[in-house]
C-alpha cells in the first residue's frame, strides 16, 4: 500500500490502474525470482527446514503461485509482446487488453497452499515463516528485494530499455 492506503497489488477498473497493478505484480514476482535464496535464508531455522522439507507444505523450494487467471493474462501478454519495436496499433491493442483484466476473486487464486509465496487476490502471502518465528526478518528481506527490483525497473523504463512488459527473464 501507499502512504495514503492505495493497494498497489489490487487490479483496477481502468487501464491506467491495471498497468500500475501489473508493474507491481510483475516486479514482485521478479524480486522473488532474483532474491528467492535470500527469502529462504530469512526463514531458515532447523525446525522450519525440517517442516518445509519433510512434513508440511509449502516445500523448501521458493516458488510463486499466481492463480490460473493471472497466469493466463501474463502468458497472453508474453506471447503477443516481442523484443522487436512495437507498432502503435500493437501498443494500443495491448493497452486495451490490459484494461480488461478481470476482477481477481479469492476463489481463483487461493487454491494452492503448497507455494511459499502466493498471490491471493490483492496481496502476496509469504507462507514459509514458521509459526513460532518472528516475521520481521523475512519482511525486511522481501520489502528490500521488491524495492531493489522496482528501482531497477524504473531505471530501465527511464532509459527506454523496456520496450514491453515481461513477467520473467530468460
Language-model-derived ranges and their functions:
Residues 1, 28, 32, 119, ...:
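Generic structural hydrophobic/aromatic packing signal, biased to beta-strands
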Residues 1-111, 118, 160:
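Loop-rich catalytic cores of soluble enzymes, especially ATP-dependent carboxylate-amine ligases
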Residues 67-71, 95-98, 136, 140, ...:
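Low-complexity, intrinsically disordered regions enriched in charged/polar residues
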Residues 111-116, 133, 137:
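Generic recognition of flexible, low-complexity loop/linker segments
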Residues 123, 127-129, 134-158:
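An acidic, glycine-/histidine-flanked metal-binding catalytic module
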Residues 163-170:
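Conserved small/polar residues in nucleotide/adenosyl-binding loops
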Amino acid at each position: 500500500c501507499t502512504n495514503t492506503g492505495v493497494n498497489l497489488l489490487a487490479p483496477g477498473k481502468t487501464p491506467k490502474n491495471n498497468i500500475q497493478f501489473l508493474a507491481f505484480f510483475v516486479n514482485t514476482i521478479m524480486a522473488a525470482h532474483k532474491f528467492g535464496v535470500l527469502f529462504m535464508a530469512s526463514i531458515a531455522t532447523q525446525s522450519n527446514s525440517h517442516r518445509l522439507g519433510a512434513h508440511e507444505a509449502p516445500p523448501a523450494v521458493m516458488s510463486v503461485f499466481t492463480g490460473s487467471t493471472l497466469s493466463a493474462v501474463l502468458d497472453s501478454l508474453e506471447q503477443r509482446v516481442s523484443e522487436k519495436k512495437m507498432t502503435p496499433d500493437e501498443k494500443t491493442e495491448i493497452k486495451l487488453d490490459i484494461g480488461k483484466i478481470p476482477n481477481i476473486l479469492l476463489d481463483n487464486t487461493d487454491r494452492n497452499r503448497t507455494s511459499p509465496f502466493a498471490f491471493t487476490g490483492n496481496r502476496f502471502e509469504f507462507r514459509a515463516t514458521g509459526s513460532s518465528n518472528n516475521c520481521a526478518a523475512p519482511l525486511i528481506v522481501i520489502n528490500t528485494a521488491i524495492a531493489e527490483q522496482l528501482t531497477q525497473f524504473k531505471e530501465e523504463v527511464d532509459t527506454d530499455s523496456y520496450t514491453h512488459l515481461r513477467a520473467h527473464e530468460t
